[in-house]
Design a protein with these regions (language model features):
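Alpha-helical interaction/regulatory segments in DNA maintenance proteins
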Residues: 2-26, 127, 312-315
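Transmembrane beta-strand segments of Gram-negative outer membrane beta-barrel proteins
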Residues: 18-54, 72, 76-82, 118, ...
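Short loop/turn motifs that connect adjacent beta-strands in outer-membrane beta-barrel proteins
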Residues: 20-26, 76-77, 109-118, 127, ...
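Outer-membrane beta-barrel translocator/receptor signature
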Residues: 39, 46-52, 56-68, 72-80, ...
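Outer-membrane beta-barrel and related beta-rich outer-membrane complex signature
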Residues: 43, 130-134, 187-200, 250-254, ...
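Exposed, low-structure sequence patches enriched in small/polar residues
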Residues: 59, 63, 164, 220-255, ...
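Surface-exposed extracellular loop regions of Gram-negative outer-membrane beta-barrel proteins
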Residues: 66-100, 106, 136-146, 243-292
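Outer membrane beta-barrel
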Residues: 96-190, 312-325
Length: 413
């Protein structure tokens, strides 16, 4: 009897050796220098009387922007590097800065036995649909068709951005069908403080050009710890995440109506379930999360059906209660935050010809609680139609029509 048996080959990961890393790794150094061709008001020295009344009218540093980045990469298994940056107007080597204003270091190791990922220094996280933790990039309304695998991810952070990352250690392990991730972060951050020393809001622009902006630099520390466990099969995955944050100062929500359900403590706890099922042309994924403050919750679910390689359809539902608080949440939304929003999105994509692609979507959104400038519930709708035509190998034409209507104070949309 003669028979043939075929199976996927077992890939053996090579051992990482110092000699190999030094010889075959890729080193890269890049730098950027921006020289403005005009003089902004912040660099003009005002009269002494004006300067005494408002010292924040003058930038403390020169008008040059500069950064330098070093990165090392060995295949897709080992990465490390650092970044140093000075924004235009920030002091260099003075006012407490050790040369540059901001520094960042990252180290990432992948695929060493059961250890899938190890990150040290600065890193990014993504779990589920981002309702609990997501410091990675979120999809826009026109890119939902391109969404890939939503498995938990730990990635290196090598950007010049001074927000949307964690600093510490993170690790992911795989035991058969179970993925386990754990992380800890200690991160100094910027904040605007009230007179009593509580946090009014977190400052995210990373600019420290004036005395006022410097006074907000790293005046708060954020400690974060969390874990995620995900069970995977060929067609289905189910995961649970728990995330805890502690700030060195308490938040203060203020007295404004729209801020009534804003953060008002220094400790925050979030937990969520994320799930995904895919089979042939259909895929469904989502997440449901809860927060300890105000008892809020949030859920987001989306489905994609591909009729064939030319036609596909997507639908997305979201419901974020106004009591939900997720300071590290980042997901699909109209209002830019995972709170006080519900809505339904549907879109289609068609390629009747190889050179032609048509896409359209409609998104309806509703805000059940007051927003800044709108002291009542509000709603809106957005629709887009786009045509992409590949004329030749060198030319591509695109056209887009977009309609968006949002309710304003005292005016229906």
């Amino acid at each position: 009897t003669l028979f043939v048996y075929v199976e996927n080959p077992v890939e053996e990961k090579e051992k990482l050796r110092l000699k190999t890393l030094l010889k075959e790794g890729r080193h890269e150094v890049t730098s950027r220098l921006d020289v403005p061709l005009y003089k902004r008001d912040g660099y003009k020295i005002p009269e002494d009387e004006v300067l005494l009344k408002n010292p924040n009218k003058v930038y403390l540093g020169n008008s040059l922007y500069h950064n330098i980045r070093y990165t090392y990469q060995y295949r897709n298994r080992l990465f490390w590097g650092f970044t140093a940056e000075k924004d235009a107007g920030e002091p260099f080597g003075s006012y407490g800065n050790k040369a540059y204003d901001a520094y960042s270091f990252h180290f990432l190791l992948k695929d060493c036995g059961k250890l899938k990922t190890l990150a040290l220094g600065d890193y990014r996280l993504g779990f589920g649909e981002g309702l609990v933790v997501n410091s990675d990039f979120s999809l826009g309304k026109s890119t939902l068709f391109n969404m890939g695998d939503t498995r938990p991810s730990i990635k290196k952070f090598s950007s010049t951005s001074e927000t949307s990352f964690f600093r510490g250690i993170a690790a992911a392990f795989r035991f058969g069908r179970v993925d386990m991730s754990a992380f800890y972060s200690y991160l100094p951050t910027d904040a605007t403080l009230r007179k009593d020393g509580t946090i009014s809001s977190l400052k995210t622009d990373g600019l420290h050009r004036t005395l006022l902006e410097l006074s907000k630099k790293h005046n708060v520390t954020e400690q974060s710890v969390g874990t995620d466990v995900t069970w995977n099969t060929e067609y289905f995955s189910l995961g649970a995440i728990v995330f805890y944050q502690h700030f060195s100062r308490s938040f203060s929500k203020g007295t404004e109506l729209y801020r009534q359900y804003y953060p008002d403590e220094k400790d925050f706890l979030n937990a969520g379930l994320h799930y995904r099922w895919h089979r042939d042309r259909f895929s469904f994924s989502g997440e449901t999360a809860f927060s300890n403050m105000y008892g809020g919750w949030a859920t987001l679910n989306k489905a994609i059906y591909r009729f064939n390689h030319r036609y596909s359809m997507v639908a997305l539902q979201r419901l974020f209660t106004y009591q939900y608080v997720g300071l590290r949440a980042n997901s699909f939304s109209e209002g830019g935050a995972v709170r006080n929003e519900s809505g339904f999105y549907t879109g289609v994509e068609a390629s009747p010809l190889n050179e032609l692609k048509l896409s359209a979507y409609v998104d309806y959104f509703y805000f059940p609680w007051a927003k800044f400038g709108i002291p009542h519930t509000s709603e809106g709708v957005e629709g887009t139609f786009q045509v992409d035509w590949v004329v030749s190998g060198k030319w591509e034409l695109s056209g887009r029509y977009q309609l968006k209507r949002k309710e304003r104070y005292g005016q229906p949309y």
